[in-house]
Design a protein with these regions (language model features):
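Conserved alpha/beta-hydrolase catalytic His-Asp/Glu region
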Residues: 7-61
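Flexible "cap/lid" loop of the alpha/beta hydrolase fold
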Residues: 1-4
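Short beta-strand/loop motif that positions the catalytic acidic residue
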Residues: 65, 71-73, 77
Length: 128
């Protein structure tokens, strides 16, 4: 079943953003407009991505990661809830976890200045 682009745009908005963004009528109109222009299409690449996604518990494998890691969770993410990011960070020895408020699944677009500052601070702490 192929749903209308306008329906898909509204659904994507609800699953992607925080209540704070969703309460801003101007932001909602802009994002719906953008999602209407760029609808999700079931391309071969997207289908392969879905098939390649790991289905099992990967946490035991994460315990062998030795590279410094920053896991960022978005507080209002309904697609990948922040507790799952925390679980990943807890599984990686020495990993840092940061939860960013007022952000949904696309938190890096909602609050890019906060996300970018966190990533830059992490890199700086590593000497980069």
């Amino acid at each position: 079943v192929q749903l209308p682009v306008s329906y898909d745009a509204k659904f994507r908005l609800l699953e992607s953003f925080s209540p704070k963004t969703l309460s801003n009528d101007e932001a909602v109109a802009e994002w719906i407009g953008m999602f209407n222009i760029w609808p999700i299409k079931l391309t071969p690449g997207l289908i392969c991505q879905g098939k390649a996604s790991p289905q099992g518990n990967r946490l035991p494998v994460y315990r062998s990661i030795t590279t410094p890691v920053l896991v960022i969770g978005f507080a209002d993410d309904v697609v990948t809830p922040p507790h799952l990011g925390k679980e990943v960070a807890d599984a990686i020895p020495g990993a840092q976890y940061l939860q960013i408020a007022d952000t949904g699944h696309l938190g890096f677009l909602e609050r890019p200045e906060v996300v970018n500052a966190a990533v830059l601070k992490f890199f700086a702490s590593m000497g980069y």
